[in-house]
């Protein structure tokens, strides 16, 4: 549901998601956070794992710039249902993932990537709030030279299309 929203506009299948998430469920040094409401309903999730265990598409820009992926913890998803946004849970997701990253031997940086979309994208809602202010407050810096290409099927599209994602990095 959340990834169907702008900016990802993802329309994948459950099997695609299971395959993607298997990296996290099979890695002993990954972290999967599930946020639940008072009734036990899932309201959000967040993930991280050493960059060396992430998909090769995410490691490639680091290799091509002479950076050692072993020094990075890759922060994957961080999603919350709309009623739960703006309550500090996103910051808590970062707190937990940064603490986990610091516990991993040799990891010196936290990193994640975000899809690049033009500000005038036709599917951008008027009410869209960019998470970039949160990322800046947490001292993440956009790294325009570190980009990855990852393909997925967008809503109302017949097949997968490539998307550029730019990495953000923070020293730990």
What residues fall within each predicted segment?
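Conserved GNAT acetyl-CoA-binding A-motif
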Residues: 75, 94, 101-127
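Conserved acetyl-CoA-binding loop-helix of GNAT-fold acetyltransferases
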Residues: 80, 86-102
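A short, well-structured alpha-helix characteristic of acyl/acetyltransferase catalytic modules
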Residues: 1-5
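Polar/charged side chains located within well-ordered beta-strands of beta-rich proteins
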Residues: 46, 94-97, 135, 170
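Conserved acyl-donor/pantetheine-binding loop and adjacent beta-alpha core of acyl/acetyltransferases
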Residues: 45-77, 122-123, 128, 146-160
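Short beta-strand micro-motifs in enzyme catalytic cores
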Residues: 31-33, 71, 162-168
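C-terminal "cap" of GNAT-fold acetyltransferases
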Residues: 127-133, 138-141, 148-172
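Active-site rim helix/loop that mediates acceptor-substrate recognition in acyltransferases
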Residues: 7-38, 42, 47
